[in-house]
Amino acid sequence: MTLDISTLSSWIGKTETMQEQLSPELVGRFNATLGSNFSVEVGELAPLLIHLCLAQPALPADQLGEDGHPRRGGFMPPVPLPRRMWAGGEMTFFGPLPIGAQVKRHSTIRHIVEKQGNSGRLCFVTVQHEISADGTPAVREQQHIVYRGPPVTGGVIPDAAAPPEQGMYVRQIAPSPIMLFRYSALTFNGHRIHYDAPYARDIEGYDGLVVHGPMQATIMAQMAADLHGRPPTGFRYRGRSPLFCDQPFTVNATPSDTSMLLWTARPNGPVAMQAEAFWDN
């Protein structure tokens, strides 16, 4: 399949702006989904990365693709490769997101790059999100999305390298179908690999329902804040291999003075997602 990069590149600079109130009810649903206990009082600080649950596109079903994502060619470029994954991203935090604030997300297509991977052709699309709360800048995010070809025989994604030694701090997570369904609902994410097991296996070639990358990033960012005693000023993460529903995984953290390495992994490897949190001195 040929990628017409010159045509796809015409999407660079395209923008989209959406907004939504950060309600106490949303924080309550966030707590119920991830097992956290953040305050739901108006004016209190909302959990880290809850902005991923806010101001998401809400399109009618007839404007969605087979995979459950918005049909390409609107805000996102019409990349002809069938499978989409959240590859990673970087975030800079300028200020808090208070509960009750009106949150605006201004999104811009920044880069579109074609690469050749071990499993075939890839197309990376970078979207920059500027998040503000009641008009005050709060988060700048670079989101990296990768489009891939059809699954190859024998599995779509080979295992990555074995995980490093266990982190200084370790948390166990047992992802259930309910947890995945609830996080999809929180983020209004229609991607069927998270709740439609036959589709995930038979069409996209996964071993089962896939644990959301953004959910892993959220858990790691909050773990970093809890261990350090305050939220980071920067956070970056990269997906390496998938995690699956009903297969427990670990969240690992090893801190230093001004940063913290984090990763998720299956009990016997491989690493699923790597992250690093930063704090200004």
Labelled PLM ranges:
Residues 10, 17, 21, 51-54, ...:
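Residue-level preference for alpha-helix termini and adjacent loops
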Residues 1-102:
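Hydrophobic, proline/glycine-rich low-complexity stretches
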Residues 2-15, 86-175, 242-246, 250-281:
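HotDog/MaoC-like acyl-thioester-processing domains
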Residues 2-45, 160-216, 223-226:
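A contiguous, surface-exposed recognition patch within enzymatic or periplasmic domains that forms
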Residues 200-258, 264-276:
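Catalytic-pocket segment enriched in acidic/His residues
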